[in-house]
């Protein structure tokens, strides 16, 4: 990536400000960084390794069992070694499954699973928890860099600036990517757009289908902007929606469809090559809020799909559903 001289000078000034802020806020305290191995947490780890005593910095990777991409763990191990920082791995699979039992809930998962997992490693009350949360995250809504012992030094900056930090520390963007998305990556569980009522059925389908998808694309050398398998449908039927953008040649997509059809917990496979209509049941607190519905339409029900989506909302009488559930879908051309 090429930047102008003015961009470089501005970036250097921003980086210097972040470095000074970390030195001032952390000081001699222990600093445990929630480390996903992604863009944001890697940039924070690199800066911290540069300006703090290394023995005061610990990278904490919260693993979700099979819901963690294998490439994620590979990146975490490689980067922690490259940065020469100690690494702790905390397994929070069962907690995550419990959180998602009542429907998709990424923000709640961040609080109850990811941050809670990092907090488990704290032995000294003066230890700070570091997060790479920035302007692109909902965390930014709080507008506070320091909140309840959690420190977010990137809160006022965006992704472009953070990418420049990586360049400054000679870390290539490929080192922090897993191939799921050019934009925002995470765990496999976020692609389950229904209640995780039975992990061995609902969880198994989203784990295996997404791992197979990335494995096939990796073998072919394809690096799409979006690559995921969303699992939707009623509780007793798992419908796998294959999202790849741009769409590769038919031979590759045919192989992906064939492989996914062999998964025992996948009941139907659909390649998203046209706009989709999604039938979504929602908790009353979401259904009755235009703002909440709009956020979901722009986020998990719109972002990371290979084509446009239109949503038909219904209020759910199921008191076990705390968020939303995509109960059905069809391609618009079939309407």
Feature locations, PLM:
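ATP-dependent adenylation/nucleotidyltransferase module used to activate substrates
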Residues: 1-168, 240, 257-266, 278-335
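Intrinsic-disorder/low-complexity, polar/charged segments
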Residues: 7-9, 38, 205-211, 242, ...
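Short, aliphatic-rich beta-strand segments
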Residues: 59, 233-246
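Generic alpha-helical secondary structure
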Residues: 111, 206-213, 249-257
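Generic beta-strand/beta-sheet core signal
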Residues: 132, 243-245, 272-274
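Short, flexible, solvent-exposed loop/turn segments with mixed acidic/basic and small polar residues
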Residues: 142, 228-234
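Mid-to-C-terminal catalytic subdomains of enzymes
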Residues: 163-228, 269-283, 289-302
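Short, non-transmembrane amphipathic alpha-helical segments
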Residues: 244-270
């Amino acid at each position: 990536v090429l930047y102008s001289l003015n961009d470089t000078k501005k970036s250097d000034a921003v980086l210097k400000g972040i470095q000074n802020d970390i030195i001032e806020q952390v000081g001699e305290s222990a600093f445990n960084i929630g480390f996903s191995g992604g863009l944001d947490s890697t940039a924070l780890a690199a800066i911290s390794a540069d300006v703090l005593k290394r023995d005061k910095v610990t990278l904490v990777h919260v693993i979700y069992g099979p819901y963690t991409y294998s490439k994620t763990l590979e990146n975490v191990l490689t980067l922690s070694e490259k940065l020469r920082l100690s690494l702790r791995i905390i397994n929070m699979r069962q907690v995550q499954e419990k959180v998602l039992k009542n429907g998709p809930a990424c923000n709640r998962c961040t609080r109850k699973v990811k941050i809670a997992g990092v907090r488990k490693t704290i032995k000294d009350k003066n230890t700070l928890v570091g997060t790479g949360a920035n302007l692109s995250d909902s965390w930014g809504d709080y507008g506070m860099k320091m909140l309840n012992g959690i420190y977010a030094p990137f809160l006022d900056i965006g992704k472009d600036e953070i990418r420049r930090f990586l360049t400054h520390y000679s870390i290539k963007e490929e080192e922090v990517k897993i191939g799921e998305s050019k934009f925002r990556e995470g765990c496999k569980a976020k692609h389950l757009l229904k209640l995780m009522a039975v992990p061995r059925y609902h969880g198994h389908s989203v784990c295996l289908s997404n791992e197979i998808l990335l494995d096939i694309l990796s073998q072919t050398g394809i690096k799409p902007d979006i690559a995921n398998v969303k699992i939707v449908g009623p509780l007793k039927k798992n419908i796998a929606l294959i999202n790849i953008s741009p769409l590769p040649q038919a031979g590759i997509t045919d192989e992906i469809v064939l492989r996914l059809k062999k998964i025992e917990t996948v009941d139907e496979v659909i390649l998203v090559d046209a706009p989709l209509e999604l039938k979504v049941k929602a908790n009353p607190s979401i259904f009755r809020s235009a703002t909440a519905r709009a956020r979901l339409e722009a986020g998990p029900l719109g972002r990371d799909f290979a084509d446009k989506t239109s949503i038909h909302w219904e209020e759910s009488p199921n008191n076990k559903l705390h968020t939303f559930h995509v109960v059905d879908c069809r391609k618009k051309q079939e309407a």
